[in-house]
Amino acid sequence: MKYKEQEFTLELKENIQCMEKEIERISFKLFKDYSYFYIEKNMELFIELIRDKEYPFETGYSLSVSIAVLDEEGKMIEFYTVPIWECCNYFLGVPLQIRLWGSKLSGELVDESYCEIEEELKERLEEFLQFADEE
């Protein structure tokens, strides 16, 4: 869901922070549940919440959860990211990382619920394991 700068409220900020905490909890749970299966296949699993910048309504702020799978040599063989929140300036529809005169600040929050994000991540983890079995 897209938000204009005028819609950047304390309620939205709290919603983003709540989403961050819940996604972090889900990430730890999934890592705990799935890392053993990857170790059995001589692979390494990383699930990480990535936050660029500190303040959610700052230009260039982004929040996402990423899954990375490394083979036994340490090479990345799978990668997947789910964006949660992104705040950016736009000038004539073009995203900018800096604030220019006449540009508009807006943000986009994922439309999915925590449960839907958890299911999406589980599906990817299962897919990556299935792909490893086929090789």
Predicted regions and their residues:
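Intrinsically disordered, low-complexity regulatory segments enriched in Ser/Thr/Pro
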Residues: 57-119
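Short amphipathic alpha-helical surface micro-motifs
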Residues: 26-30, 46-50, 61-64
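Well-ordered alpha/beta subsegment
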Residues: 112-115, 119, 123-126, 130, ...
